[in-house]
Amino acid sequence: MPLHVGREGKEDLGYLSDNTGDNISHKNSYYSELTGVYWVWKNFKDSENVGICHYRRFLVNDAGRLFTEAEIESLLSRYDLITTKTLTMRYPYYDGFAHNHNQKDLDVAMEVIGELYPEYMDTLNVMVHKRETWFGNIMICKKTLFDTYCSWLFPIFFEMEKRIDVDAYDDYHKRIYGFISEFLLYVWATVNGLKVYQCKVGMLGEKAETKELKLALSEFFIKKDILGAKQYILEALKKRPDVLMEASDLDGELKLAMQVITT
């Protein structure tokens, strides 16, 4: 079921929108896909199972195809949650977050969790220093479990809003709650001992930001302006460090360009 996430203040695309009913659509610039997650939690009552995907990312079976309804039913009879494969990072999660985002935001998240859910802290303090996470907030599970997760997650962020000011951040770094939630889903599932089925993620095309960056770099290369290309991509990475991630640079062209520029 297509859902226009972040619909508030945007053009009507003819889809079901997340600015109806009980919603936080106006917070999309801070919450990313979580405004859709919130909408499903509060307003969708028509199915025993629910799933969250993106406009270009989908959970797929071992054959690389979308799961059939029968496959999902079979998996959920044996597992609590279907989600992405665990991502192994170059650095511990805490260090990587501090490098790409504002460290104090993660510190505040941990502070709030310690106050609201102190029983999570032993596990959280271990996991935050491991080199593992989940990504994308992509999942399938029973609606009852989904509701339980949302009831745990959103109070954390609503309290964080009272303690941090993200209005001075650029558009990428404002999406702080969307970023942190990817890791918190992993923590929540671990603490609650969920039986998790991890699967591949199918992707349709590259991010618009990745395409734009490649096009700009090609113009520099055509002019043989390597220094200009280096300055451009380094400045772009300050605003969008995600463009070099495998989920963004699908064919590895940007990483190759970085090697050319920096050698």
Per-segment meaning from a language model:
Residues 1-263:
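ER/Golgi luminal nucleotide-sugar-dependent glycosyltransferases, focusing on the catalytic module
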